[in-house]
């Protein structure tokens, strides 16, 4: 059975280390969906809006810890792949492709070591360097 939009948005938020209530889901802009697929860039922007500036650093820290599955202090390709594996490929959301995930790592990886540390991750979120979905 396919999950509804609300369930998938809650999973996405959990994967990012935060959560969305049913009320938050209702407040999501309708333009976040385009031709039945999900607009990740608008989702990330909206999540940042849900957290007041005083809460943004905490939200980023929580999201980083959630994504850093092995607690190495880095988000690595295998951890990105894990997140991709828990996002359903059908329904109102479209998971990132391998190429889009690689583009995200490259956008954030300012040190060029193929992985994302906390500072790079924080900068990615704060500076909106998330690559656009094709």
From Swiss-Prot:
Signal peptide: none annotated. One of its GO terms (cellular component) is troponin complex. Ca(2+) 2 binds at residues 109, 113, 120. InterPro entries: EF-hand-dom_pair (IPR011992), EF_Hand_1_Ca_BS (IPR018247), EF_hand_dom (IPR002048), Parvalbumin (IPR008080). The keyword Lipid biosynthesis does not apply. PANTHER family: PARVALBUMIN ALPHA (PTHR11653:SF2). This is Parvalbumin-like EF-hand-containing protein.
